[in-house]
């Protein structure tokens, strides 16, 4: 049945994308399995109107007896995709409702976030990673429980002046998760499903994994030779209770496809509006021409619009070298990726469990090469 659906989808593609281009995509994804970067993957491609192609590759583990990943039912630990799939849209809805102001100081909503120059850190700075906070802190080693982790987060000093430079930081989104809880009055694990995932029709995405879905969930590591799955891989997220602003969501390829279609539709999908076109455009607008970050989203830095350094070929970027100025996306440490290019009406969801016992050294860099090659192949085939 899956093969029939895939073939039908390919037959319905616009002329700019055809079966040959999807065979190239298959070959690129399968090369990552052959090289030992990941045991399996799912790929979902499409545009505003819907999914055009979807497929699962390899297996959930290196054993051929383990299930083949399925775009509809295999749940992946989304890692940092949680930032843009859960936390950021929750903030966007609160902004639209007038409950949060992007340029208000964070301390207005989180009064314990004080000290030094923290009074100048705004909500916007958390979203675009210009707060001045350090990139990372081992809360799981330095604290004993969620309360002590939150206390450490609040007292962590800034490393740079607020607004001065971009430094991608999990701490920014840990704070945003706490902000969503403070303003909404609900735990993140309740608010995000109610305010974001449910309205978006993402029925197979959430914090943690239901018992009925465990056998079809991709493991993200090993312990004493056995697969480890179904609880968040990120140890800081675990310290924060499993549902944190920077990590914690599990989801499927087709659910994430719905989410990207919603953004291509400027906040609307299947007659349901999550937020207004103005809010969608606000969160997808760069602060300046050379910006590499949007509000939550990453802005691929290699494009001819001057954002970042020129990309060397082969391009050492998860997004390749061909995306337009309008493109946006994000990656996750476990091996997850999504991006969309509104100028080409194209989205890509590419989920792997790279973190599960990779057979290749420096699998993060190797996966980046696969992602970049895939992006370039798809964009070139979609360009008249």
PLM regions and their residue ranges:
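Short, conserved catalytic-motif segment at the N-terminal edge
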Residues: 22-76, 99-101, 151, 234, ...
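Structural recognition of the beta-strand scaffold that forms the well-ordered cores
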Residues: 42-44, 54, 125-127, 206, ...
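Bacterial N-terminal signal peptides that target proteins for export
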Residues: 1-8
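Hydrophobic h-region of N-terminal signal peptides that target proteins for export
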Residues: 10-19
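Short, surface-exposed loop or secondary-structure junction motifs
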Residues: 57-59, 116-326
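Short, P/G- and charge-enriched loop/turn segments at secondary-structure junctions
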Residues: 30-32, 75, 162, 322-328, ...
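Structured C-terminal helix/loop/strand segments within mature extracytoplasmic catalytic/sensor domains
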Residues: 327-384
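Short active-site loop at a secondary-structure junction
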Residues: 34-42, 64-125, 160-172, 244-247
């Amino acid at each position: 049945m899956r093969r029939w659906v895939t073939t039908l989808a390919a037959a319905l593609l616009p002329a700019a994308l055809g079966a040959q281009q999807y065979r190239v995509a298959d070959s690129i994804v399968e090369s990552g399995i052959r090289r030992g970067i990941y045991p399996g993957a799912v790929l979902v491609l499409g545009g505003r109107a819907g999914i055009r192609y979807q497929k699962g590759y390899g297996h959930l583990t290196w054993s051929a007896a383990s299930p083949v990943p399925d775009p509809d039912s295999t749940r992946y630990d989304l890692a940092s995709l949680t930032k843009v799939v859960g936390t950021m849209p929750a903030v966007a809805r609160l902004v639209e409702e007038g409950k949060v102001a992007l340029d208000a100081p964070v301390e207005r909503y989180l009064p314990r976030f004080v000290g030094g120059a923290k009074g100048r850190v705004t909500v916007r700075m958390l979203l675009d990673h210009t707060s001045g906070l350090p990139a990372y802190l081992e809360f799981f080693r330095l604290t004993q429980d969620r309360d002590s982790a939150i206390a450490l987060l609040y007292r962590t000093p800034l490393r740079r002046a607020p607004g001065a430079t971009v430094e991608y930081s999990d701490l920014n989104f840990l704070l945003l998760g706490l902000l969503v809880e403070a303003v909404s009055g609900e735990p993140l694990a309740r608010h995000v499903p109610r305010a974001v995932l449910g309205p978006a029709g993402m029925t197979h995405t959430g914090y943690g994994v239901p018992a009925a879905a465990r056998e079809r969930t991709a493991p993200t590591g090993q312990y004493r030779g056995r697969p480890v799955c179904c609880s968040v891989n990120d140890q800081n997220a675990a310290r924060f209770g499993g549902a944190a602003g920077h990590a914690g969501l599990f989801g499927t390829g087709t659910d994430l496809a719905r989410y990207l279609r919603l953004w291509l539709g400027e906040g609307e999908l299947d007659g349901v509006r999550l937020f207004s076109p103005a809010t969608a455009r606000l969160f997808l607008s760069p602060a300046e021409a050379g910006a590499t970050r949007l509000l939550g989203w990453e802005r691929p830095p290699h494009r001819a619009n001057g954002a970042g350094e020129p990309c060397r070929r082969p391009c050492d970027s998860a997004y390749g070298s061909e995306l337009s100025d309008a493109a946006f996306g994000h990656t996750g440490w476990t091996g997850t990726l999504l991006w969309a290019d509104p100028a080409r009406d194209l989205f890509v969801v590419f989920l792997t469990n790279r973190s599960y016992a990779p057979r290749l050294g420096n699998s993060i860099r190797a996966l980046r090469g696969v992602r970049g090659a895939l992006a370039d192949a798809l964009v070139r085939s979609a360009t008249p």
